[in-house]
């Protein structure tokens, strides 16, 4: 997980309104979003989609296959995929391109990123009317695949897409964190995996795992290399530890509260 849930800022199932999505992303002075009556199948559209995939080939193929399937259903819509390895780079590029009118039609984002994008004039398309469209919206009758209905989206997740009276994203991507434990090694060190994992347990077992044999190899695995504990995202680790320790991070106004002695002690 990366700070907050990732959201897709323009709904893929609603790409039937491609021209409007294009018009609603860009620099200053764009016209306000207007809900069309019908999807114009006589026109061809190209939508740019910025996504993240960690250089994971499996994930890349998922994107590519989804786009291929979508384009087969909607032959007059082409999706131009651009992959990033960092969410921050997507955010920075969107901000940069707002000024030049070259923002993507669709991108993966965080809720706090959307709040920044909204400082532009009509930069992000509100999705409320699109959600509610009986033909092309969530669970719409004219959607050419088995799209989700609004009732099938977890309300709490959808609420995170709501800003100043409108929905601007859909939670089609969610992240979660899991801890994987090498039970064999833990028990070899003389410990039992607890039902509820604590940081104290992690630190104690990690320290015990560093014991070495006379030849310099680690006792627990007999190898020259051992990483007793690794957290994929150190950013997430700090945020989780702040939250679990009851320390402040930020408030609803966006004020940073993490620059204090408590944070220093964790770092």
Residue ranges and their predicted role:
Residues 42-56, 77-82, 106:
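Short, well-ordered beta-strand elements
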Residues 1-47, 72:
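Short, low-complexity disordered leader/linker segments with a strong preference
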Residues 54-56, 86-89, 112-115, 175-178, ...:
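Solvent-exposed loop/turn segments at secondary-structure junctions
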Residues 69-152, 188-190:
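Extracytoplasmic "Venus flytrap"/periplasmic binding protein-like
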Residues 35, 146-147, 157-158, 164-167:
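Short, P/G- and charge-enriched loop/turn segments at secondary-structure junctions
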Residues 60-67, 91, 95, 111, ...:
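Extracytoplasmic/secreted envelope proteins and their assembly/folding machinery
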Residues 55-78, 180:
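Short, polar/charged alpha-helical segment
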Residues 72, 128-135, 159-267:
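Helix-loop-helix "hinge/cap" segment bordering the ligand-binding cleft or interdomain interface
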